[in-house]
Amino acid sequence: MSGPSKGRKIRVLVGGVFDILHVGHVHFLKQAKELGDELVVIVAHDETVRRNKRRNPINPAEDRAELLRAIRYVDEVYIGSPGGIDFELVRRINPDVIAIGPDQNFNCEKLKEELKRHGIEAEVIRVPYLYKSDRAKTTKIIRRIVEEFCE
């Protein structure tokens, strides 16, 4: 990474679904923020969630974005486009660092190649697990809710 020009803040970008916000999300956002000065989040579009997770999101993208805006580590929030990574949006955000969550299904090297192909120069960093438990997994939280309230 060549780094930002003198005086420019280091901008960190993360993306994700962030459905049923939980402590694991908060720890990830905190760790990502510590990589720079500004933290920008791209929330997955509802169609993207349906395609990738094969289920509807519990909360619509607008609600997930509003919740993320309320977290002190987050400076800006965008809702992504339906489909894959919106490289045009990433280019506009102009991140210095892209932080990948510990359980996000991304190959960092392939992502770096894709970014380069789209003319985006950013360091890609996988954030390690800080808080690993069933309380920090959305699917396990949903399962517990179903078991507790639906059976």
Swiss-Prot record:
Official protein name in the record: FAD synthase
Listed Pfam families: CTP_transf_like
Enzyme Commission designation: 2.7.7.2
Tagged with keyword Nucleotide-binding: yes
Organism from which the protein derives: Thermococcus gammatolerans (strain DSM 15229 / JCM 11827 / EJ3)
Superkingdom of origin: Archaea
Class of the enzyme per the UniProt entry, highest EC level: transferase
Annotated keywords: ATP-binding, FAD, Flavoprotein, FMN, Nucleotide-binding, Nucleotidyltransferase, Transferase
Protein's job: Catalyzes the transfer of the AMP portion of ATP to flavin mononucleotide (FMN) to produce flavin adenine dinucleotide (FAD) coenzyme.
Subunit architecture: Homodimer.
Molecular-function annotations in GO: ATP binding; FMN adenylyltransferase activity
Family: Belongs to the archaeal FAD synthase family.
Listed pathway(s): Cofactor biosynthesis; FAD biosynthesis; FAD from FMN: step 1/1
Reaction equations catalysed: FMN + ATP + H(+) = FAD + diphosphate
Binding, ATP: V17, F18, H22, V23, G24, H25, D103
Signal peptide: none
Cofactor(s) named in the record: a divalent metal cation
Protein's GO biological process: FAD biosynthetic process; FMN metabolic process
